Amino acid sequence: MGLENSLILFSLLVLVLGWVQPSLGKESSPDKFKRQHMDTEGSSKSSPTYCNQMRSPQEMTKGSCKPVNTFLHEPLEDVQAICSQDKVTCKDGKSNCHKSSSTLHITDCCLKGSSNYPKCNYTTTESQKHIIIACDGNPYVPVHFDASV
């Protein structure tokens, strides 16, 4: 009886770990947003090579060249506060997007036409624009960069 119970418990443990394990290493949407879009150091400083320097640490080019990416050079708290500002419709039609009430310092990285993975080459364009972000969760935080306007 003892061996039979042990086998049942072991089987249940393996089953539970099989369900839980895939989510253990998965990056959350808020963490992915921070990794892909936040550069609070504001390290671009008008460098024409900023986007090419950022492609590896921010994983802009993991398996393929990302066509466009925008970095936000503002404190995370300021970006999170946008989640309580004006609601707008997202590009995909969802209703969880919010538009910043003021402009933010951003850098747009656009893939140059002749670039192919793994040698992704980007143009760097700094500007001050309003941004639109999707927010979700509890607490309600940024999970997707939708646009700059």
UniProtKB/Swiss-Prot annotation:
SUPFAM superfamilies: RNase A-like (SSF54076). Substrate binds at residues 32, 35, 66-70, 91. It catalyses: an [RNA] containing cytidine + H2O = an [RNA]-3'-cytidine-3'-phosphate + a 5'-hydroxy-ribonucleotide-3'-[RNA]; an [RNA] containing uridine + H2O = an [RNA]-3'-uridine-3'-phosphate + a 5'-hydroxy-ribonucleotide-3'-[RNA]. Disulfide bonds join 51-109, 65-120, 83-135, 90-97. GO terms for biological process: defense response to Gram-positive bacterium. Residues 1-25 form the signal peptide. Its EC number is 4.6.1.18. The keyword RNA-binding does not apply. The keyword 4Fe-4S does not apply. The active site is at residues 37, 144. Pfam families: RnaseA (PF00074). Its main location: secreted. Residues 28-42 have a biased composition (Basic and acidic residues). It is found in: Secreted. One of its GO terms (molecular function) is nucleic acid binding. Residues 25-62 are annotated as: Disordered. InterPro entries: RNaseA, RNaseA-like_dom_sf, RNaseA_AS, RNaseA_domain. One of its GO terms (cellular component) is extracellular region. Residues 43-61 have a biased composition (Polar residues). It comes from the Eukaryota. Keywords: Disulfide bond, Endonuclease, Hydrolase, Lyase, Nuclease, Secreted, Signal. Monomer. Interacts with and forms tight 1:1 complexes with RNH1. Dimerization of two such complexes may occur. Interaction with RNH1 inhibits this protein. Belongs to the pancreatic ribonuclease family. PANTHER family: RIBONUCLEASE, RIBONUCLEASE PANCREATIC. Endonuclease that catalyzes the cleavage of RNA on the 3' side of pyrimidine nucleotides. Acts on single-stranded and double-stranded RNA. This is Ribonuclease pancreatic. The gene is RNASE1.
